[in-house]
Amino acid sequence: MARSELSALERRWLADPPQALARIATVDADGMPHVVPGGWSFDPATEEMVLGGRDVPRTQRALHVRASGHAAVVVDGLAPGPGWSPWAFVVRGRARVDDDLGVIRIAIDQVTSWGLGSVTAGAAAGE
């Protein structure tokens, strides 16, 4: 279930995340989804997902964010070891283009995650 607040496990995961691509989803003027992989980080001061890449302010995703003011992002992967152990961190929220830094910032209006304990220090604590 989606929440608006980060859990303690999510905060630990964001403080030391595994190397993984993010996928940012936006919607164009016709309502057609647009999904693009890219680099990411988390700004703990503003509690925003920060999505970078090459010349971001001139991209289609930036155009969509400027028009709609919203976006979603997924960071996901598979836990190390045998078997199928997926993990994911999903955010939906208000988005804006930061032209000065050349990134897109997404506020956490809704957050959902699963399997993060398998790829964080909290895994040893049984979280």
Which role fits each region the language model picked out?
Residues 19-54:
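Short beta-strand segments
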Residues 103-127:
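Flexible glycine-rich active-site/ligand-binding loops centered on an Asp-His dyad
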Residues 7-11, 36-37, 58-60:
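A generic local structural motif
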Residues 1-23:
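Short, basic/aromatic recognition patches
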